[in-house]
């Protein structure tokens, strides 16, 4: 399993990004979490099989309908997750 940390910048708060990402992650079988950050970005930790991880990363570049993603920063993460949750 692969685990990544994503920092998603742009108009990503107040557009149901976290809940939409939770639904997409659950559909893909991805575990981890997503939360808003105080700087206006969204941060997520995602863990899953390579094809599912590629799909959630691609999804994060556009997000839900009203989001306007400007940039996604991707870093490795060493967490281990069992489900996908919206936190904070």
Each language-model region and where it sits:
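Intrinsically disordered, low-complexity, mixed-charge
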Residues: 1-88
């Amino acid at each position: 399993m692969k685990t990544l940390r994503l920092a998603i910048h742009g108009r990503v708060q107040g557009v149901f990004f976290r809940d939409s990402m939770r639904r997409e992650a659950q559909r893909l079988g991805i575990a981890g979490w997503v939360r808003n950050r105080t700087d206006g970005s969204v941060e997520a930790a995602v863990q899953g099989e390579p094809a599912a991880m590629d799909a959630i990363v691609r999804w994060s570049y556009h997000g839900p309908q009203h989001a306007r993603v400007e940039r996604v920063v991707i870093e490795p993460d060493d967490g281990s997750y069992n489900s996908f949750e919206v936190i904070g």
